[in-house]
Amino acid sequence: MTVSYNQSVATSRPWTFLALIFRWRGSVWSAIWIQYSVWLGLYFLVSAIYRFILSAYQQQIFVRLVDYVNSRMSYVPLDWMLGFFIAGVLRRFWYLYDIIGFIDNIACSTATYIRGDSERAKQYRRNIIRYCELTQVLIFRDLSMKARKRFPTLDTVAAAGFMMPHEKANFDLIQYNYNKYFLPFNWAWALVYNARKEGLIEGDYYVTVISEDIKKFRTGLAWVCNYDWVPLPIIYPTIVCLAVHMYFFVGILARQYVKGSEIDPDMIDLVFPFMTSIQFVFYMGWLKVGEGLLNPWGEDPDDFETNMLIDRNLAMGLKIVDEGYDKTPRLEKDAFWDDTWVPLYSEASAHEKRYHQRQGSLAHIKIGRSVSQVRMVPRDGRRASIVKERIVNVKPGSGIGDILRPSSLLNLMKHASSSRSLERQRSPGSFRMETLTPGSPTNTPIEPIDKIDKKK
């Protein structure tokens, strides 16, 4: 059963992590306690031999051996190896979950496009869902131990109602050296085709929609099989597991508290390997994460709930195509038809802090408040005669003002005294655009460009 902890960490608090640390099921403690107990027992055994059995001369040799091994513990690149290993395993895990197969899309398209209240139409809709789910059952029982225990044989699949006796007879007629996962999908597609021929589907496009949903479902299950058939190369998890276990096996000797150490002459004899125990929890726990995600079809606490998904898909699919078919509510005006929409909250939540408006981080910045006129020119001054320029009259308090659009710099100087402005009415707080046109008087006097340049 998947361990759910989302409610415990719904809100971040300084003590939130305690809700996870003191859990047992699915925790790091339940994953490493056996290895840690064995390692700690061996550590104290070696420590007792050093303290109470070895002679003084033998202790000196032991100290030199401890120094030699401890100085070379960094030769094993655990951080690098575990980091790449966990990253690769985690990507496989989430991809498998994405394609594991939820039947909702097939059910919704089937209920929408296969029309009719007759028993025949209802049989079409229900059997399409059942055939798709039958394939998922056949695949899961070959991948997941939980599903295998539930359906040890095909007879148990038929007894559970996923396959009718005559369907199992047709299934057994095909003698094939490989898996027959394709057969229920063929039945489902054939039903879609027959429903179109009988007029239960109104157009070929709707046949394509239903067929595409079935195809996506089938493709996802095919990739699930591919990932099970071709796992990560065995040398990869082997070398990572070997590195972690060998590191701490050598650490039984290297992390002993000894007297007269040349590497750490000021070593405090704590008897208990406190810092090494912390390191053991982190590294061994990290390795257990990878081992748990390497094959999510087992019976670990966080493995996929295949039986739950099978039950959920069949129940949800049949409910959608049966009770959910053609049950549209009566069409009426909504509550905001004649009124402005105002967000409503419960009285308890209405006093909470307002949520952040999704705007740009600089949307509230107003540039050009102290400038009365802004001249927009091309970066290349040699093109001033052929490129349109703009002069913006900044309105007080708005940050953006009237935009004057001469056709060119020469036209601006020629027609500045004989042009008029065309005003576009805007709402309060917005800006107006004034365009200079040749031969028209202007209401807003504009200084010639040469005077503006002299002022600069």
Swiss-Prot record:
Keywords: Cell membrane, Chloride, Chloride channel, Ion channel, Ion transport, Membrane, Transmembrane, Transmembrane helix, Transport. One of its GO terms (molecular function) is chloride channel activity. The keyword Ion transport applies. It comes from the Eukaryota. The chain crosses the membrane at residues 29-49, 83-103, 234-254, 267-287. Residues 416-456 are annotated as: Disordered. InterPro entries: Bestrophin, Bestrophin-like. It is found in: Cell membrane. One of its GO terms (cellular component) is plasma membrane. The keyword Cell membrane applies. It is a multi-pass membrane protein. Its main location: membrane. Forms chloride channels. PANTHER family: BESTROPHIN, BESTROPHIN HOMOLOG 18. Forms oligomers. Belongs to the anion channel-forming bestrophin (TC 1.A.46) family. Calcium-sensitive chloride channel subfamily. This is Bestrophin homolog 18. It comes from Caenorhabditis elegans.
